[in-house]
């Protein structure tokens, strides 16, 4: 940067006045007139103004005839380097008298938070030193890296060649060695360093992470290594006593807010932090707020604000998380996943109703009562869940209604919870047209009576053994009568492949008319079907389900049979049926 420009900036403390904290000129620089987010940065400030300076050597700590820290008129403390200018002849910090090497004196300025540096300047009240090192820290003083060196002998002092006129030759910024500060007519001197002087031309701060890292600092350290005295002092010989003297240490920079804030403020703990916008938070606006993670955090640029977006949860969640895989699959548009959806909603965006609820078409999706309970009838419905769009519950046979709360036309209510609605009976055939006369039943079949012992041999001779509950009266369909049943337990399954659940039991119409077997709605029965004696072609003329044709046995259920049948079932699985 040209010397005349530094002189303009540093005269009469104009920078400190221009860079004092305050509200931005625009009401909200982080948003345009349409309230769309845009990149914004804090104003240029003197980051060192009013900050404490830690000096390794200060004249007057031990009182002498020149300096006395207890006397305001003779005190030359390091705080004078960063105090606001207000006197015609500024007071200067002075180091102790230095008589022999090493002549190193360090001035350290903690900036309080990360800043993006523009320049560093230091005005000397006496002849400026001929060797100075400028360092920065990005971790509040835990580690240091050089920003630049200033020397009349770069190779001897720092092992570096003088800085080329066109900047560094490498692809990224580097600490170069510049000429030592020049003495001025008033007897002092000026150290002026532009941070951009150490970076190659053409790098764009918005789009260069390397340059962003280069200009970022939380602390600045100036190391004065060789005073301006005659002769070479590197050999450590005794010289004329000398002390460094300087004033107006300025660190021009902006609060590092990554393009998401236009100013910095003091928080409740007195720490300097960015006044973050665009859904960001943190001292440097370097992360998204907890609910603003629909896309990953990015630094704002002049082309794109990269504002953090709130997750789309339709007002039903307060927390969400970011999923990179979903973000990629969406074409880098949305990656938020809502957590702990409320108001009976579910889904990534809390956009549908959870199981047992359905969407109320009369309310918007963001309404707290957008999801209504299915309220399926405990007897008439086959389950507790309903269609999430229409609210229709799954009804049992013969049951209808949105909640399955009434019998369908042609059905009447029964006392069975298995089949709450049965087909309305139609008048049966007259005595003249009855296919089986009462007097013929005795010769046709005889209902099972008395006790019945189930042996392994009898069990193995049957195709299947199941426990069924009759849901309604039988319905004659030609030569077969159909009884709706529920299979409650399966002890043996043969070719019929009996399974638990709703089914049908087919009984020959002649047998059903004579009560062989006699099946009553709501009762449970043991069905031993098939086996030797079963009628040939017994499946002809009937539908899917179980059959109780000749050779089958239907007995009123006894709970005591459960253990016996399970034991026979285990013996069958061990292959005992082949020996029975």
From Swiss-Prot:
InterPro entries: Laminin/Netrin_ECM (IPR050440), Laminin_N (IPR008211), LE_dom (IPR002049), LMN_ATRN_NET-like_EGF (IPR056863), Netrin_domain (IPR001134), Netrin_module_non-TIMP (IPR018933), TIMP-like_OB-fold (IPR008993). Residues 1-17 form the signal peptide. Glycans are attached at residues 104, 387. Disulfide bonds join 92-125, 255-264, 257-274, 276-285, 288-308, 311-320, 313-338, 341-350, 353-371, 374-386, 376-393, 395-404, 407-421, 441-514, 460-577. Very low levels at 10.5 to 12.5 dpc in dorsal root ganglia. High levels in motor neurons at 13.5, 14.5 and 15.5 dpc. At 11.5 dpc also expressed in the developing limb buds. It comes from the Eukaryota. The keyword GTP-binding does not apply. It is found in: Secreted, Extracellular space, Extracellular matrix. Residues 441-577 form the NTR domain. Its main location: secreted. Residues 36-254 form the Laminin N-terminal domain. A motif (Cell attachment site) lies at residues 500-502. Gene3D superfamilies: 2.40.50.120, Galactose-binding domain-like, Laminin. GO terms for biological process: axonogenesis; myoblast fusion; regulation of DNA-templated transcription. Keywords: Disulfide bond, Extracellular matrix, Glycoprotein, Laminin EGF-like domain, Repeat, Secreted, Signal. One of its GO terms (molecular function) is signaling receptor binding. GO terms for cellular component: extracellular region; Golgi apparatus. Pfam families: EGF_laminin, EGF_LMN_ATRN, Laminin_N, NTR. Residues 255-310, 311-373, 374-423 form the Laminin EGF-like domain. CDD domains: EGF_Lam, NTR_netrin-1_like. PANTHER family: NETRIN-3, NETRIN/LAMININ-RELATED. Netrins control guidance of CNS commissural axons and peripheral motor axons. This is Netrin-3. It comes from Mus musculus (Mouse). The gene is Ntn3.
């Amino acid at each position: 940067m040209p010397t005349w420009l530094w002189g303009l900036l540093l005269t009469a403390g104009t920078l400190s006045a221009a860079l004092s904290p305050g509200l931005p000129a625009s009401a909200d620089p982080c948003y345009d007139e349409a309230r769309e987010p845009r990149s914004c940065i804090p104003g240029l400030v003197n980051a060192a103004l009013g900050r404490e300076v830690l000096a390794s050597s200060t004249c007057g700590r031990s009182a002498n005839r020149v300096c006395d820290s207890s006397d305001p008129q003779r005190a030359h403390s390091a705080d004078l380097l960063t105090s606001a200018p207000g006197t015609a002849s500024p007071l200067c910090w002075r180091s102790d008298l230095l008589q022999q090497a090493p002549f190193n004196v360090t001035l350290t300025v903690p900036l309080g938070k990360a800043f993006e540096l523009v320049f560093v300047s230091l005005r000397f009240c006496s002849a400026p030193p001929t060797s100075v090192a400028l360092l920065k820290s990005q971790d509040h003083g835990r580690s240091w890296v050089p920003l630049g060196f200033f020397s009349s002998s770069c190779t001897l002092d720092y092992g570096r060649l003088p800085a080329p006129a066109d900047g560094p030759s490498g692809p990224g910024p580097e600490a170069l060695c510049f000429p030592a500060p020049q003495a001025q007519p008033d007897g002092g001197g000026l150290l002026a360093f532009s941070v951009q002087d150490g970076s190659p031309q053409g790098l764009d701060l918005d789009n260069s992470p390397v340059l962003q890292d280069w200009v970022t600092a939380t602390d600045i350290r100036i190391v004065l290594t060789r005073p301006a005295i005659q002769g070479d002092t590197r050999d450590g010989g005794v010289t004329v006593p000398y002390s460094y003297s300087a004033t107006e240490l300025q660190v021009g920079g902006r609060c590092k807010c990554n393009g998401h804030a236009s100013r910095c403020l003091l928080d409740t703990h007195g720490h300097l932090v960015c006044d973050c916008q665009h859904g960001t938070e943190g001292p440097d606006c370097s992360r998204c707020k907890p609910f603003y993670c629909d896309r990953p955090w990015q630094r704002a640029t002049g082309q794109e604000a990269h504002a953090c977006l709130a997750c789309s949860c339709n007002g039903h969640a307060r927390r969400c998380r970011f999923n990179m895989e979903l973000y990629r699959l969406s074409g880098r548009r949305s990656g938020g996943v809502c957590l702990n959806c409320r108001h009976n909603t579910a889904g990534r965006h809390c956009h549908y109703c959870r199981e047992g609820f359905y969407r109320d078409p009369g309310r918007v999706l963001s309404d707290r009562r957008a999801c209504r309970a299915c309220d399926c009838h405990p007897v008439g419905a086959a389950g507790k869940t309903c269609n999430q769009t229409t609210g229709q519950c799954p009804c049992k046979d013969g049951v209808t209604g949105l909640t399955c709360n009434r019998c369908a036309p042609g059905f009447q209510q029964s006392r069975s919870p298995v089949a709450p609605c049965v087909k309305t009976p139609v008048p049966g055939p007259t005595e003249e047209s009855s296919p089986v006369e009462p007097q013929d039943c005795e010769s046709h079949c005889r209902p099972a009576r008395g006790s019945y012992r189930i042996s392994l041999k009898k069990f193995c001779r049957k195709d299947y053994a199941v426990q069924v509950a009759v849901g309604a009266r039988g319905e004659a369909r030609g030569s077969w009568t159909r009884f709706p049943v529920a299979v409650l337990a399966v002890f043996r399954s043969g070719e019929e492949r009996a399974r638990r659940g709703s089914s049908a039991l087919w009984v020959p119409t002649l047998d059903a008319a004579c009560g062989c077997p006699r099946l009553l709605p709501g009762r449970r029965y043991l069905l031993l079907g098939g086996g030797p004696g079963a009628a040939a072609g017994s499946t002809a003329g009937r539908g899917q389900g179980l059959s109780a044709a000749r050779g089958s046995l239907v007995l009123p259920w006894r709970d005591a049979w459960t253990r016996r049948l399970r034991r026979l079932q285990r013996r069958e699985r061990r292959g005992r049926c082949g020996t029975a």
